[in-house]
Design a protein with these regions (language model features):
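Short gly/ser/thr-rich secondary-structure transition/capping motifs
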Residues: 15-21, 87-89, 171-173
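"Short basic amphipathic alpha-helical interaction patches in structured regions
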Residues: 47-53, 121
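Structural motif
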Residues: 34-36, 80, 106-108
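Short, flexible loop segments at the rims of nucleotide/cofactor-binding pockets, characterized by
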Residues: 10-16, 81-87, 119-120
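Membrane-anchoring hydrophobic helices of lipid-metabolizing enzymes
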Residues: 1-39, 44-48, 57, 75, ...
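Short beta-strand segments
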Residues: 37, 63-64, 108, 145
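Non-catalytic C-terminal accessory region of glycerolipid acyltransferases
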Residues: 91-226
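Conserved nucleotide-cofactor-binding alpha/beta core module
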Residues: 54, 58-100
């Protein structure tokens, strides 16, 4: 069994995927961070950021859909969340222990990959759990912006599903194919300044929206080259 980072490197080499991330070098490795990012890809973005966090901090954890536990080489870094039923006691304990620990944690507050609305690709409304966890754990929040989008086909399927009133995210079935479509690409990611949760104002929803706004403002700070 390969270590998670080695598995990621082999996968990216075979897919000819590369990325550049700016801003992590400004962060104190001794701090406890909760990284929050937009979610354009539904898997690939998590692997890129996880690789960068392991490189910078030595290890990391990523909050993911529990279906990704089937990717066995990455199980050590996953914090699985059951989005289709009750969370198991083992998963809940793993989640709590990670937030109580010191390793950096990455989460995608949208909970699913971005969708297209009015011609603009952006996250669906963010869930509030990351704000609650940041306050409870005393972790500083680091916003991350990931450049990228999926195919027009994926967004059309998602829109059709919504128009038909189907609640199940059937477009998820195309995510593996969408990931392989990204082969040969280079991506840009940028990290913002840490945000102390105690410095956020308003309701939990307002606080989450503030952080989301910071994430999307980082688009203006993407490095000029990939």
């Amino acid at each position: 069994n390969r270590p998670p980072q080695e598995f990621i490197h082999v996968a990216f080499e075979r897919m000819r995927i590369a990325y550049r991330i700016d801003g992590l070098e400004r962060l104190d490795p001794a701090e406890r961070y909760l990284f929050v990012a937009n979610h354009p890809f539904g898997g690939l973005d998590g692997m890129m950021i996880a690789d960068a966090l392991i490189e910078r901090f030595g290890d990391a954890r990523v909050v993911v859909n529990d279906l990704l536990m089937h990717v066995e080489p990455l199980q050590p870094i996953w914090l699985p969340v059951n989005k289709h039923g009750r969370q198991t006691a083992a998963y809940a304990r793993r989640y709590d222990e990670a937030f109580a620990g010191d390793l950096p944690i990455l989460t995608f507050p949208a909970g699913l990959c971005s969708r297209r609305r009015g011609g603009v690709v952006s996250d669906t409304p963010w869930r509030l759990n990351f704000i609650k966890r940041a306050h409870a754990s005393g972790r500083k929040i680091v916003p991350l912006y990931v450049e990228g989008r999926l195919s027009d086909f994926f967004y059309r399927i998602a829109r059709l599903r919504e128009r038909l009133g189907i609640k199940l995210n059937v477009e998820m079935l195309w995510l593996p194919d969408e990931m392989f479509r990204q082969g040969g690409s280079r991506f840009r990611i940028v990290a913002g300044d840490p945000i102390a949760p105690d410095g956020l104002r308003g309701t939990l929803r307002q606080q989450a929206d503030t952080v989301r706004g910071e994430v999307y403002r980082l688009k203006e700070k993407l490095p000029c080259t990939k």
